[in-house]
């Protein structure tokens, strides 16, 4: 019949020929998860800043100032240190060989992420004191599985899938992923804008809610040493 037996055997062994083409390829697993660990480092770094610095401004020798002025008195120091942390972390990523299509946007994205995270942690800590600091810890614990940093969010339990769009890490990680694997449409700007929404919420908490709780917080701070003694 003129049929080549070898051709038939090859067809039966592999009836479909697949051609693979990588879209936005990432050269290593380390580069793939670098956005997650970079975000984690920036959040932890911001939390450490809040933990080691006194958040309330000393009134001695300054005179009277408003609650808003007191809030920004520590704010400037913290965001500057947070920006320095972001530069060190992102440049460090580049030095150790993390894949990056656009190094400049990678570093600038890290600074924007750190700025947002420091504002969130600072607002929570100054407004709700120890409870706010505890919320900061809870947030980082929840965001590790809920941000799709290491595994697709579809593989996570339903609770974390529900939280996924509500977490700052989700957009911080996606922001850096754009600079690692390659840009797609306006995703970089979209994630940057969502981080801006979190920033606005943080400023609202710090500037609007904090003054309402200021007297209660001062009373709590005065009573705390007495209880310890």
Where are these regions (language model features)?
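Membrane-spanning alpha-helical segments of multipass transporters and channels
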Residues: 1-229
């Amino acid at each position: 019949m003129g049929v080549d037996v070898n051709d038939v055997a090859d067809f039966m062994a592999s009836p479909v020929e697949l051609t693979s083409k990588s879209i936005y390829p990432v050269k290593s697993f380390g580069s793939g998860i670098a956005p997650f660990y970079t975000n984690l480092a920036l959040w932890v770094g911001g939390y450490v800043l809040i933990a080691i610095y006194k958040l309330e401004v000393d009134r001695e020798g300054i005179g009277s100032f408003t609650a808003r002025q007191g809030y920004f008195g520590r704010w400037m120091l913290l965001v500057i240190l947070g920006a320095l942390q972001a530069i060190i972390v992102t440049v460090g990523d580049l030095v150790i060989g993390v894949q990056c299509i656009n190094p400049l946007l990678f570093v600038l994205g890290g600074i924007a992420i750190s700025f947002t995270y420091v504002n969130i942690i600072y607002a929570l800590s100054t407004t709700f004191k120890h409870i706010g600091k505890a919320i900061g810890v809870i947030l980082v614990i929840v965001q590790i599985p809920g941000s799709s940093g290491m595994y697709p969010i579809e593989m996570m339990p339903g609770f974390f899938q529900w939280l996924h769009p509500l977490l700052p890490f989700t957009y911080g990680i996606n922001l850096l992923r754009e600079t690692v694997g390659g840009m797609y449409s306006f995703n970089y700007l979209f994630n940057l804008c969502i981080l801006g929404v979190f920033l606005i919420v943080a400023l609202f908490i710090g500037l609007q809610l904090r003054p309402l709780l200021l007297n209660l917080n001062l009373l709590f701070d005065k009573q705390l040493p007495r209880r310890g003694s």
